[in-house]
Amino acid sequence: MSHSASPKPATARRSEALTGEIRIPGDKSISHRSFMFGGLASGETRITGLLEGEDVINTGRAMQAMGAKIRKEGDVWIINGVGNGCLLQPEAALDFGNAGTGARLTMGLVGTYDMKTSFIGDASLSKRPMGRVLNPLREMGVQVEAADGDRMPLTLIGPKTANPITYRVPMASAQVKSAVLLAGLNTPGVTTVIEPVMTRDHTEKMLQGFGADLTVETDKDGVRHIRITGQGKLVGQTIDVPGDPSSTAFPLVAALLVEGSDVTIRNVLMNPTRTGLILTLQEMGADIEVLNARLAGGEDVADLRVRASKLKGVVVPPERAPSMIDEYPVLAIAASFAEGETVMDGLDELRVKESDRLAAVARGLEANGVDCTEGEMSLTVRGRPDGKGLGGGTVATHLDHRIAMSFLVMGLAAEKPVTVDDSNMIATSFPEFMDMMPGLGAKIELSIL
């Protein structure tokens, strides 16, 4: 599904205290995997709390195209899966729209099948490099026909029987790790992924939950060895998807920045590989209270009470990047209102997201009067605690949902309004954002440029 052709600019203005309780839409990583693993498992999978953004729905459609039966009854998604090893060759190309996660994970899932599968996406996704996922698949015997630079549109031609490999992930990427593990599901023998820096581990936890023969060992240097034995049986599960920490970041930072705010966010995923932003904000002096911490479906979940806070600049350790890679844009907004300097380093992954996210953030900050320096892999922001002189600019979002939401948050606390050139694509990850934020008291509206 492509975004509407005509852009919908939006403007955020300085707001009074934000107050209330909200429940964030389901986690995107877990939602993608729920559709995939449910579609692959034998028997019935029932999902509540699924993120119904376009990206996740595209993953569901891809699984339907390969034989899974998916329907919705009330609030519950019900999937009847095909059984591991029994995916069918899709009749047409699988269209992932803007969904990098869905596309890359599905490439792993189907690559080792003896069939031909084509992948297409929107203009933004078609610019993103897929080689990091395709290279290990090539080692397993998959043939690839791709556009220049291993980009989409592309076609995978699977081997008669795939070779199990041992693959050391060359960069901190949960998508690459996951793609290789999923390829291992349909491969005889043991497929091993060696991960020098731990990244989000939903694939491992959820595959174990669905019954895969998967083990994780961490050596004395913190290097993880993940082994999966292929061609085993997966069994349908019941899943309640917790709230997405990456989406939580926007109302959370807004509540910290808008004077007098007091907001409670319910049912947030607190998986330790995803909480880098909360940790960083707490180091900056944020008043974030973790309430009712609990385990749900093997994942850590809690409620967060967030109150307006005076923030101070910090140096964010580069090794924290994998646990908050999607949150740097909104952290840069928080840093714009913090006293002193905030240094963010190790941001090379941001160059290959929906946009060159690092450059997009730096340009947006500059357009709104923020003193910042963009390095090769770093961003330094010198803040203005009172928001004086900030705002007044229009931000080029480059079809990137996180850039759009981050700068709308900025406008809520800046002296002058902030406009983003398009808000259509917010629907890819957080369709409720434009209604939920005004419900707390945020002044955000669609604007006429």
Curated annotation (Swiss-Prot):
Organism: Pseudomonas sp. (strain PG2982)
Localization of this protein: Cytoplasm
Cited HAMAP family: EPSP_synth (MF_00210)
Pathway(s) served: Metabolic intermediate biosynthesis; chorismate biosynthesis; chorismate from D-erythrose 4-phosphate and phosphoenolpyruvate: step 6/7
GO CC term (a single one): cytoplasm
Residues that hold phosphoenolpyruvate according to the record: K28, G100, R128, Q175, R357, R402
PANTHER family assigned to the protein according to its UniProt record, in alphabetical order: AROM/DEHYDROQUINATE SYNTHASE, PENTAFUNCTIONAL AROM POLYPEPTIDE
Residues the entry annotates as binding 3-phosphoshikimate: K28, S29, R33, S173, Q175, D326, K353
Gene Ontology MF terms: 3-phosphoshikimate 1-carboxyvinyltransferase activity
Described function: Catalyzes the transfer of the enolpyruvyl moiety of phosphoenolpyruvate (PEP) to the 5-hydroxyl of shikimate-3-phosphate (S3P) to produce enolpyruvyl shikimate-3-phosphate and inorganic phosphate.
Name of the protein: 3-phosphoshikimate 1-carboxyvinyltransferase
Family of this protein: Belongs to the EPSP synthase family.
Region (Disordered): 1-23
Subunit field text: Monomer.
Additional notes on this entry: Resistant to the antibiotic glyphosate.
Taxonomic path: Bacteria, Pseudomonadati, Pseudomonadota
Residues forming the catalytic site: D326
